[in-house]
Amino acid sequence: MGKIIAIANQKGGVGKTTTTVNLAASLGVLEKKVLLIDADPQANATSGLGIDVDAVEIGTYQVLEHTKTARETIIQTSSPNVDLIPAHIDLVAIEIELVDKDDREYMMKQAIRDLKDSYDYILIDCAPSLGLLTLNALTAADSVIIPIQCEYFALEGLGKLLNTIKSVQRIHNPDLDIEGMLLTMYDARLRLSNQVVEEVKKHFSDMVFDTIIQRNVRLGEAPSYGESIIKYDASSKGAINYLNMANELLKKNKEKV
């Protein structure tokens, strides 16, 4: 049975979507069957996998609305072993539509539970907020990965996210684990980057992945070509970092790599 992992941080610009797309692609290269669910109205994970967002007619919106089954919305991507439930800007309206429903936090869980037998990993790219979309993802997930950028204000809002996770564990999903914190946008030349790494490891030592994602020009270029870093430049630092991250995740979950 597959594992559902939400990639979440309400702070924007931390490498959340970059991590979701490239972790999915890396796991696919390592011959794991992966489904990426784009739960962010900005739909950057969708476009980052080469899908024309304007051409998306059904996706996460319909899944949460329960007007389409999750299986009906799945599309194949050009990344090996990676499927996608795409997003569109209309997803921004779903929180308003769900707000009056009694089981509003469970809509995604109900919709995707049957997919766990079809995939090794289901990755959910969360919106940069702690609204209903993110609550749905955390309620549906087995665990959560928290990307943290190695920059000023890196820990800002982290306490609020951890409190939200505790609240979800208490009320909606007692089995939710923190898979780990992933340090991103690291530049070894900068004192600040090194200070952030030290600070995060000091406070959350056993929760931090050993792999650190370095700042990399090619990593920033790949989304504009609708490609993962693995496909865009497999020899780049970014590709190597995310393949290392995928291997670390598999080892953590005691899978052969």
Segments from the language model and where they lie:
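P-loop NTP-binding core
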Residues: 1-257
